[in-house]
Amino acid sequence: MDTLLKTPNKLEFLHPVHGFSVKASSFNSVKPHKFGSRKICENWGKGVCVKAKSSALLELVPETKKENLDFELPMYDPSKGLVVDLAVVGGGPAGLAVAQQVSEAGLSVVSIDPSPKLIWPNNYGVWVDEFEAMDLLDCLDATWSGTVVYIDDNTTKDLDRPYGRVNRKQLKSKMMQKCILNGVKFHHAKVIKVIHEEAKSMLICNDGVTIQATVVLDATGFSRCLVQYDKPYKPGYQVAYGILAEVEEHPFDTSKMVLMDWRDSHLGNNMELKERNRKVPTFLYAMPFSSNKIFLEETSLVARPGLRMDDIQERMVARLNHLGIKVKSIEEDEHCVIPMGGSLPVIPQRVVGTGGTAGLVHPSTGYMVARTLAAAPVVANAIIHYLGSEKDLLGNELSAAVWKDLWPIERRRQREFFCFGMDILLKLDLPATRRFFDAFFDLEPRYWHGFLSSRLYLPELIFFGLSLFSRASNTSRIEIMTKGTLPLVNMINNLLQDTE
């Protein structure tokens, strides 16, 4: 799944280096929390197999390593004092995608990031058809012909929809090379302040450099470096712990990606942990690359407050023990927290947002990378159009027009429905969650495909909801009616208040 934000084990949002939705992995210096009281030997030898147990598994996490792209970047020259058309704050997929497309139109663009050549540490999983539509199939380093969902020990859903893992080095290289070819300049710094004038904005960087731009794009992820909010931000949280590991063996079919494994038989001997999992369930997400290399991630789909990281790690250890997965080595690990739902930023406002900054994460699933990349042409084309239009839009008027194109009313209504879905999921325990997904993946593919990929709009979403309700068990229908009534009322009220 998309992994976007680094946290320690308590859900404390760190003040991040802008431009990176910070995520703990082997690419940073945050040490994983060691849980369990068993003392661990210091000298695990190379090739030693470790049956997942207490903190022994985490002792295999490698030391920090950072990998940079191996090519030179054209740097921004502050001595010229030029006003660029677009300043992009943040060098993640969201920011680079817009920078690439705006610069293709011949506009001047500067990308500001403290580590512009650093390869993203995030693990991104996407539906293959989403990347195919954007001509990005060459940026997938592994694909599976389908996915599987384990509802419980007796019910399995085989989904005929190919899935892939993003090659983050290839994706960033491809985007950066196009930016360079188009004349994008890069500045190695962090933006600490923005000052707006009538027709331009001045970005003050931590190295003392001031960059002037007609349009400012905040692509800093959930740090929300420049974009402003005027409502309480109360999202749900998707929390996960994952490892890319070499194992002796694993029980999964290497031709299928495990989208969700809701089984809890691994908790049979630990009633306290089983009860916690019943109340706030977690599932396994797994990418089997071969018979002995696999990405494993224990995930809480959405909770408020989010689960503690050590709780999730404990559940993962119990699951791996039960599955007989013996870890030989860990190539990288990740702690991720994805805020889901919550209020949108102030719309419109002078700084334009994209990606996590602009609320593009799917409130019901946590998916974002494909949605963000698909939204890049919308943002880029709006900037290109309004900068070059005869209307002579500048400053607040120009930004307002771009925001309107990014969040038209049909997209806002769609997001409201997705938040309604999240509010229901927040209330479901493990049995109810199983019943929900048993019905969800029995829907016609066009419905569940469209829901997961943000392709359904409100009229279609209403039919989606009715279809889901009709396929649900009687127990699940009662749960949806009792637990979904208040979220439904809130959604309808928000829809009525939100007008053009």
Swiss-Prot record:
It holds the Pfam family Lycopene_cycl. It comes from the Eukaryota. Pathway: Carotenoid biosynthesis; beta-carotene biosynthesis; Carotenoid biosynthesis; beta-zeacarotene biosynthesis. GO terms for cellular component: chloroplast; mitochondrion. NAD(+) binds at residues 86-114. The gene is LCY1. Residues 1-81 form a transit peptide. It comes from Nicotiana tabacum. One of its GO terms (biological process) is carotene biosynthetic process. Its main location: plastid. Its EC number is 5.5.1.19. InterPro entries: FAD/NAD-bd_sf, Lycopene_cyclase_b/e. This is Lycopene beta cyclase, chloroplastic. GO terms for molecular function: lycopene beta cyclase activity; oxidoreductase activity; oxidoreductase activity, acting on paired donors, with incorporation or reduction of molecular oxygen.
